[in-house]
């Protein structure tokens, strides 16, 4: 009897091992699946584990795990539905663009060896964020409420962070610590794969319209304004942005890195930033020309009326370092001249007076013709020169703008959030037109 029981137990044990072996998930061919340190103590072959190969999907470049609460079928979980097909298709599309066009990874990257990782948390309380696992491979941690948008704008943004982190994983770039440029770049990367981003997340554009005067890289604007990066990419090639990350050094901010890579001195950098802002008036970017038509020529600026026909910039939208105002002017008749006299007032009472010995400005006209073309007028600084714009004799104008930018003669890093930014007040006098 005991012998029979022993044999039966042996048979059951062997059967269990065979059944367990049969349930083991075979690893996919192609790129490896990296096992992060915090998962190495977990039995990923066990369906009852929090993370398991039994709740895994993969593409050529990604492995996607979802928590036990979803069950085996993401399209029909107990509560939280995820469109796995759309997620995998969008991930692959974003991946190829970020890698092959923007060049955020290069041949020899660790993402040539490993699939990037996506961890789906079973929660409605969570959000999404991108980064890396163990300094080895880019990763995403997401909750189902962030993958309901069919365009997956949030995922494109966060995958941007994964690719930014991949540069560090690959041993390149000391970068800039917690600089808000990372968020600005992810918004730009999202805009690259979705030209309709401004419309889809119009609240960012609405906010930027009220914050154009803020210093470049100011934390209030980092989610709202990827537009300088669009200009840089147009001017120097899309891969230049990823190269900024590779070339960034400790003790620098993105402006210092950019100037060094582009070979620009401070005056040249200010000239270039002003040119970028002139492009913002009519959104003169060929890649998104069609999509930005509803947003062209929409700026307002708060001025105070002074004596003798002068107008001063109000403190609440006075330009900071590389911040700008776009002042709408009344249209002149064909062939008529508009003259602007400009006077910088660094250190004026009621404004933040910081490094006033470094004060300078850029100002110039931007006119828009009835066929949608931009005319960029001459640019001046605070040398006391007046600027003149002559309206075309042939084409009618639909808009005329005076653009003014704070252009310090020396660059310094943005202050901490609790500290004040330098302001560059000014006044203008307009002849042949008037501010609207």
Predicted features by range, described:
Residues 21-89, 93, 97-99, 348, ...:
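Zymogen propeptides/activation segments of proteases
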Residues 38-47, 118-123, 376-382:
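Short, solvent-exposed secondary-structure boundary motifs
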Residues 6, 60, 114, 336-338, ...:
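Residues at beta-strand starts and edge strands
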């Amino acid at each position: 009897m005991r012998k029979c029981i022993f044999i039966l137990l042996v048979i059951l044990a062997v059967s269990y091992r065979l059944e367990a072996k049969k349930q083991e998930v075979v690893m996919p061919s192609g790129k490896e699946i990296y096992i992060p340190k915090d998962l190495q103590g977990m039995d990923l072959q066990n369906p009852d584990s929090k993370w398991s190969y039994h709740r895994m999907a993969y593409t050529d470049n990604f492995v996607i795990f979802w928590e036990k609460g979803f069950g085996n079928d993401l399209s029909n979980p107990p509560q939280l539905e995820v469109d796995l097909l759309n997620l995998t298709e969008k991930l692959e599309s974003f991946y190829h663009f970020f890698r092959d066009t923007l060049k955020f990874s290069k041949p020899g990257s660790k993402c040539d060896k490993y699939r990037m990782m996506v961890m789906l948390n079973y929660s409605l309380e969570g959000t999404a964020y991108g980064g890396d696992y163990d300094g080895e491979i880019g990763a995403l941690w997401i909750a189902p409420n962030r993958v309901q948008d069919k365009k997956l704008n949030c995922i494109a943004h966060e995958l941007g962070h994964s690719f930014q982190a991949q540069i560090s994983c690959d041993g390149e770039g000391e970068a800039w610590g917690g600089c808000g440029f990372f968020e600005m770049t992810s918004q730009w990367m999202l805009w690259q794969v979705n030209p309709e981003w401004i419309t889809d997340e119009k609240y960012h554009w609405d906010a930027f319209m009220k914050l154009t005067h803020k210093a470049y890289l100011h934390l209030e604007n980092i989610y709202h304004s990827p537009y300088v990066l669009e200009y840089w990419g147009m001017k120097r090639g899309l891969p230049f942005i990823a190269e900024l990350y590779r070339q960034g050094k400790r003790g620098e901010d993105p402006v210092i890195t950019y100037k060094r890579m582009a070979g620009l001195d401070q005056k040249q950098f200010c000239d270039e930033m002003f040119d970028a802002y002139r492009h913002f008036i009519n959104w003169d970017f060929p890649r998104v020309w069609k999509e930005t038509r509803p947003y062209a020529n929409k700026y307002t600026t708060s001025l105070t009326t002074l004596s003798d026909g002068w107008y001063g910039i109000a403190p609440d939208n006075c330009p900071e370092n590389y911040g700008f105002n776009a002042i709408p002017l009344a249209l002149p008749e064909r062939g008529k001249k508009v003259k602007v006299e400009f006077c910088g007032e660094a250190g004026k009472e009621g404004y933040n007076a910081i490094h006033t010995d470094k004060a300078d400005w850029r100002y110039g006209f931007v006119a828009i013709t009835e066929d949608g073309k931009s005319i960029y007028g001459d640019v001046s600084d605070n040398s006391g020169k007046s600027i003149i714009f002559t309206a075309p004799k042939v084409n009618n104008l639909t808009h005329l703008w005076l653009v003014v930018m704070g252009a310090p003669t020396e660059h310094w890093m943005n202050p901490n959030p609790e500290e004040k930014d330098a302001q560059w007040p000014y006044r203008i006098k307009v002849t042949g037109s008037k501010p609207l």
